[in-house]
Amino acid sequence: MKASHNITILLTASLLFISCKPKVVDVKPDEPTDPEKHETITLGGGCYWCVEAVFQQLDGVISATSGFMGGHIPNPSSEEIYSQTSGHVEVVQVVFDPDKISTPEILKWFWKAHNPTDPEGQGVDKGSIYMSHIFAHSPKQRELAETSKKEAQTNFDTPIVTTIRDAEEFYAAKEEDQDYYFRKKGENPYCPQQITPKLKKLGLDY
């Protein structure tokens, strides 16, 4: 779903070094090539640059689009999102081929790709916008998410705080924030400081 505004956030150089705070945008998520076959799940696991860099590498994933979901204000401005008044969460909308990678497999990567027990956000990115969420696109997917969460809990000493909700309207991030890590890892120190170690730990390309 397209956002109906075009807001530019001015980021200071120091903010780029330590946090993930981009802009809201008019970019529609990549359309599945076969809507009858492909499925969609929307995941929030901290800064969407990080989550996107993980899922776009997985075999069977058709597209991974950064954006926002879960708020109570339609067509939110950047100020409303990042002041945490709109209720939106940074997410990555993942379109995948279930014949190549299943929903439970997608979710296993999700649990490994972030710390779902952190109630304050992820790493240096703190606040409700960076908290752990799964937005299910069907009742079956929500059931699978609940089961996966219970299974994942056995790997953590503290409670998983991930919220599981039905998918809502998706607002894609600006084009400049899509495929961010692999385009900007040599320019923005946030990438080698925060994203590269995660990709190395997961055995993915970096």
Model-derived regions, located:
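Flexible coil/turn and secondary-structure edge motifs
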Residues: 20-206
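Bacterial Sec-dependent N-terminal signal peptides
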Residues: 1-27
